């Protein structure tokens, strides 16, 4: 081999050795998001929509160059809606996959399990859909943040709605049906608290506790009809809501009482699954609505989701979309995804302009509870064929201001975790 050629090969080899760390660093400049969403079963649509919307947000951000030189990478594992399995995956994400953020979760049981892992490993967990208030009050820890309304906010809005309705359409008695775990119990407890807080007179005539994903609600439906409440408050979500309403229709339940479902009842999944079967005049709400607010930003989000998936989004989609943008803003402020404590400070108080924000309002993360603060709209089912296959959507909106829906200080002092109480001093 000629001497000149051999020297060139040696020089090339040295260059490869010297530059390898830089190439590796460049390849490692990613913000890795490890998500856990259910992809099958009654909760499956929530997971499918969440993943699609998160991918939308990642693509939008990466198309603009990423954040501070970092590209976003999103991975998801089917949580199977099982807390124990989700904990195993989360630990694998952290130790093997080296994710920078934990993300997602639909079931509150899964969310409550994952927040323990987040705290143990000091890895930020962005909650995008599960709604139990416990994660932002009773069990709040430094590295947990939620970017969708929790049950306390929904029940505060619900209590205000019932207070207003009592003046024009008098009612006295309430019954409640919801799933027998934290999410279901939180709703009725927080509704009672807020009804009392706002001075509403009421009497509870029945509480009914089917298991999550129960196949048959007949016994509960007949008990409700026997107890004859003026208002039936429902705490189901997802496929459970659809199944309950379809099973209750032959009994004429919705003609005999007000059906009121202020947390998850207004999900587009219900509208698309029931069509003309869905009675008019049900009072529902959710964490995002495809037809409220009527802003350009909300229309764009809904249209972009439809272009990507061929269907309109359930409310879970916007929560996942918001979560990715919260991560991007935090990394942009800190400069990297590695300093968890700096990222916590960046997230506390963060303003997030989201598709669900009406004109003149911007969502923000409460620095005390790490809970996003948002307005909530409650509506009635009305005829509307703008979002097929649904033939019903919500209308006749009542909108409740964000700050009045948050837990008051005395509630936080009584129920808060040690971490939250330390912030209140």
What are the language-model segments listed below?
Residues 10-21:
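Bacterial N-terminal signal peptides
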Residues 1-11:
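Bacterial N-terminal signal peptides that target proteins for export
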Residues 45-52, 64-138, 147, 209-218, ...:
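Beta-alpha junction/loop-to-helix N-cap segments that form part of ligand/metal-binding clefts
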Residues 248-321, 332-334, 338, 391-424:
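Extracellular/periplasmic periplasmic-binding protein-like sensory domains
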Residues 31-55, 77-84, 106-107, 177-186, ...:
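Extracytoplasmic "Venus flytrap"
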Residues 28-31, 51-74, 196-202:
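Signal peptide-proximal N-terminal region
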Residues 99-207, 256-281:
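Extracytoplasmic ligand/sensor domains, especially the bilobed periplasmic-binding protein
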Residues 307-317, 328-399, 407, 424:
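Segments of small-molecule ligand-sensing domains
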């Amino acid at each position: 081999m000629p001497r000149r050629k051999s020297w060139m090969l040696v020089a090339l080899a040295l260059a490869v050795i010297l530059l390898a760390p830089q190439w590796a660093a460049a390849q490692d400049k990613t913000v890795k998001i490890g998500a856990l969403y259910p992809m099958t079963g009654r909760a499956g649509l929530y997971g499918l929509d969440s993943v699609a919307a998160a991918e939308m947000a990642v693509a939008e951000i990466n198309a603009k160059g990423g954040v501070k030189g970092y590209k976003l990478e999103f991975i998801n594992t089917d949580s199977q809606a099982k807390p124990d399995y989700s904990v195993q995956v989360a630990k694998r994400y952290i130790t093997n996959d080296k994710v920078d953020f934990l993300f997602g979760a639909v079931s509150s049981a899964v969310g409550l399990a994952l927040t323990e892992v987040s705290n143990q490993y000091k890895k930020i967990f962005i909650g995008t859909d599960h709604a139990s208030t416990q994660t932002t009050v009773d069990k709040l820890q430094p590295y947990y943040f939620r970017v969708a309304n929790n049950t306390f906010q929904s029940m505060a809005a619900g209590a205000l709605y019932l207070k207003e309705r009592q003046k024009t359409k008098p009612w006295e008695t309430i019954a409640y049906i919801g799933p027998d775990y934290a999410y279901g119990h939180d709703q009725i407890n927080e509704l009672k608290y807020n009804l009392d807080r706002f001075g509403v007179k009421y009497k509870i005539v029945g509480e009914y506790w089917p298991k999550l994903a129960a196949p048959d609600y007949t016994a509960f439906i007949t008990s409700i009809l026997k107890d004859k409440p003026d208002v039936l408050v429902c705490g189901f979500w997802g496929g459970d809501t659809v199944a309950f309403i379809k099973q209750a229709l032959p009994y004429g339940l919705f003609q005999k009482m007000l059906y009121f479902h202020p947390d998850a009842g207004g999900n587009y999944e219900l509208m698309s699954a029931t069509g003309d079967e869905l009675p008019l005049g049900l009072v529902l709400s959710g964490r995002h609505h495809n037809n409220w607010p009527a802003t350009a930003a909300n229309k764009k989000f809904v249209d972009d989701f439809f272009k990507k998936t061929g269907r309109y989004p359930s409310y879970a989609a916007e929560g996942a979309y918001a979560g990715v943008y919260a991560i991007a803003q935090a990394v942009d402020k800190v400069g990297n995804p590695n300093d968890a404590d700096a990222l916590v400070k960046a997230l506390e108080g963060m303003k997030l302009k989201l598709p669900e924000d009406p004109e003149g309002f911007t969502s923000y993360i409460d620095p005390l509870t790490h809970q996003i603060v948002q307005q909530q709209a409650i509506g009635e089912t009305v005829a509307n064929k703008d979002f097929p296959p649904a033939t019903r959507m919500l209308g006749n909106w009542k909108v409740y201001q964000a700050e009045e829906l948050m837990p008051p200080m005395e509630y936080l002092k009584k129920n808060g975790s040690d971490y939250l109480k330390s912030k209140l001093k």
